[in-house]
């Protein structure tokens, strides 16, 4: 059985901005999952940094990324991923919750996640 890869916004942004870890993210795209919360973060941050975002979500789908809606079943695990001082944003926690729900590996470039004390398989790219 293959473990699902769940992409954090930071991983996709690293790819778009050709930052360290971009090659690894590119290899993970086909079959990866991503919360629509994280997609929203990617679109906002990419536009903020001058990246053309028109149709970006469709480009990611064409590359094999499957977007998952953030719904009622996502709300509780996302809230439960919060802890005082963890520094995890809503987007971070949505990614972690999705990884937990599907038994997958959350992929991020945010090294702080390793110290957040979450019970999810993590892959920190840098």
What are these regions (language model features)?
Residues 31-34, 63-66, 105:
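Short loop->beta-strand "edge-of-pocket" segments that line small-molecule binding or catalytic clefts
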Residues 66-105, 109:
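Active-site neighborhoods of divalent-metal-dependent phosphate/nucleic-acid chemistry enzymes
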Residues 7, 37, 109:
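Active-site flanking residues adjacent to catalytic metal/cofactor-binding acidic residues
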Residues 1-34, 46-58:
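Short, well-structured N-terminal submotif of metal-dependent ribonuclease cores
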Residues 23-30, 46, 60-62, 85, ...:
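Alpha-helix C-terminal capping segments
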Residues 11-12, 38, 74, 94-95, ...:
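Alpha-helix capping/helix-boundary segments
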Residues 2-4, 96-126:
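Acidic, PIN/NYN-like endoribonuclease modules and their adjacent C-terminal/linker elements
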């Amino acid at each position: 059985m293959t473990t699902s890869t769940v992409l954090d916004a930071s991983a996709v942004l690293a790819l778009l901005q050709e930052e360290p870890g971009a090659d690894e993210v590119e290899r993970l795209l086909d079959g990866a999952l991503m919360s629509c919360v994280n997609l929203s973060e990617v679109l906002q941050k990419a536009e903020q940094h001058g990246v053309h975002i028109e149709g970006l979500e469709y480009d990611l789908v064409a590359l094999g990324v499957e977007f998952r809606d953030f719904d009622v079943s996502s709300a509780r695990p996302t809230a439960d991923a919060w802890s005082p001082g963890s520094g995890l944003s809503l987007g971070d926690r949505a990614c972690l919750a999705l990884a937990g729900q599907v038994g997958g590996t959350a992929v991020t470039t945010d090294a702080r996640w390793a110290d957040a004390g979450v019970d999810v398989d993590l892959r920190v790219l840098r």
